[in-house]
């Protein structure tokens, strides 16, 4: 029997029915007062979500495009930058920097381990000539389920005084507290298919006054991703290029849902679902790839010693129409990843865990008591 696909991956994430209905509406003109009024509300709600009074700009890109825009608008060829790399996406920002002729110094950690703030401190404190122009980190490393210590790393950047802090918040914004103004974050990039609860296609970049000062002298080439164009257009509640109108209508809907729930409730929900998922995996005797103290609220990576992770994922899809994410690069077939990001309910978590128990038993992983995973998650949810 055909079942309803359950997306339990870190993106694209499930889309609420209200947003699906918004996507199905007849398009409106993007140079009309109707669109401008809607965009004005969306922009204000984006500032609410980012906890900022500064600009939050919308681009027709994925999260990668948003991060690239967040780099190239504020830097010049040959600029020295520090890039934290402890997973697939940290590695990507190293590659982007190299592609644009930046002097990239990677500060690395093993996949599954958090970045060490002290390593950033050492580099920044030694930079007495203030040659480091930016520090770029991935807040929630989607490939491993690790949350990096943004607060600690940012504090060292602030002590440096000159470098910008540029943050990939693609799977943390909307799941974890990212108070842009309170932390003084210069550039924060994210994507629509994550905590925003709509399909891929929109990227978001918040920009501080300090970053706009750097923009004035930045010399890396840009046209479509020139944030200055977006800033001027956004001030008039319009866009520099044709936007994905219906995606923005859907975003208007989901941001309204988020405001109704409230930031603290959103963060609490993601933390609760993370804890339930991790408790279940421990009860099923499946090793967690990230330690509790650095676990992302958006995704849980699970190791599968003695089993092929892709067989688990395949059987979950075949038997229960539940999609789990796989490992990337050298972690391929060695881990699976459970997304608990955006429009995911406690019921979804319980359904996923119950289905996983069946699959594990079918694959011969029997060193757990039947129902142990569900019971462990239920205890978290009942508190």
Swiss-Prot record:
Family stated for the protein in its record: Belongs to the class-V pyridoxal-phosphate-dependent aminotransferase family.
Top-level class of the enzyme under EC nomenclature: oxidoreductase
Subcellular location: Cytoplasm
Protein name as it appears in the record: Soluble hydrogenase 42 kDa subunit
Known partners and oligomeric status: Heterodimer of a large and a small subunit.
GO CC entries: cytoplasm
Gene3D superfamilies named in the record: Aspartate Aminotransferase, domain 1 (3.90.1150.10), Type I PLP-dependent aspartate aminotransferase-like (Major domain) (3.40.640.10)
Listed Pfam families: Aminotran_5
Function of the molecule: Soluble hydrogenase catalyzes both production and consumption of hydrogen from suitable artificial electron donors or acceptors. This subunit catalyzes the tritium-exchange activity.
Single GO term (MF): L-serine-pyruvate transaminase activity
Cofactor(s) needed by this chain: pyridoxal 5'-phosphate
């Amino acid at each position: 029997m055909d079942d309803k696909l359950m997306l339990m991956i870190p993106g694209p994430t499930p889309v609420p029915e209200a947003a699906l209905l918004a996507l199905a509406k007849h398009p409106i003109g993007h140079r009309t007062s109707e669109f401008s009024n809607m965009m004005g509300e969306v922009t204000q709600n984006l500032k609410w979500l980012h906890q900022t009074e500064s600009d939050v700009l919308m681009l027709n890109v994925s999260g990668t495009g948003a991060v690239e825009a967040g780099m190239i608008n504020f830097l010049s060829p040959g600029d020295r930058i520090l890039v934290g790399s402890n997973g697939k996406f940290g590695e990507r920002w190293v590659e982007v920097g190299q592609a644009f002729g930046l002097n990239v110094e990677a500060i690395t950690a093993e996949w599954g381990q958090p970045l060490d703030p002290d390593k950033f401190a050492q580099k920044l404190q030694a930079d007495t000539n203030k040659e480091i122009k930016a520090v770029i980190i991935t807040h929630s490393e989607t490939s491993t389920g690790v949350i990096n210590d943004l607060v600690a790393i940012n504090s060292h950047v602030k002590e440096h005084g000159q470098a910008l802090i540029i943050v990939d918040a693609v799977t943390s914004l909307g799941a974890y507290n990212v108070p842009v103004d309170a932390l003084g974050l210069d550039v924060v990039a994210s994507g629509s298919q994550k905590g925003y609860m709509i399909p891929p296609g929109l990227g978001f970049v918040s920009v501080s006054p300090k970053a706009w000062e750097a923009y004035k002298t930045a010399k890396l080439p840009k046209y479509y991703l020139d944030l200055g164009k977006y800033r001027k257009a956004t001030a008039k509640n319009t866009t520099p290029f044709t936007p994905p109108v219906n995606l923005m209508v859907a975003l208007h809907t989901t941001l309204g849902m988020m405001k109704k729930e409230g930031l603290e409730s959103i963060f609490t929900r993601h933390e609760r679902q993370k804890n339930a998922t991790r408790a279940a995996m421990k009860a099923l005797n499946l090793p967690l790839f990230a330690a509790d103290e650095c676990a992302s609220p958006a995704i849980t990576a699970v190791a599968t010693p003695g089993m092929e992770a892709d067989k688990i994922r395949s059987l979950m899809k075949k038997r229960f129409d539940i999609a789990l994410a796989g490992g990337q690069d050298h972690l391929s077939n060695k881990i699976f990843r459970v997304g608990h990001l955006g429009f995911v309910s406690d019921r979804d978590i319980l359904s996923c865990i119950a289905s996983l128990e069946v699959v594990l038993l079918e694959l011969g992983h029997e060193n757990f008591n039947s129902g142990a995973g569900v019971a462990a998650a239920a205890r978290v949810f009942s508190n």
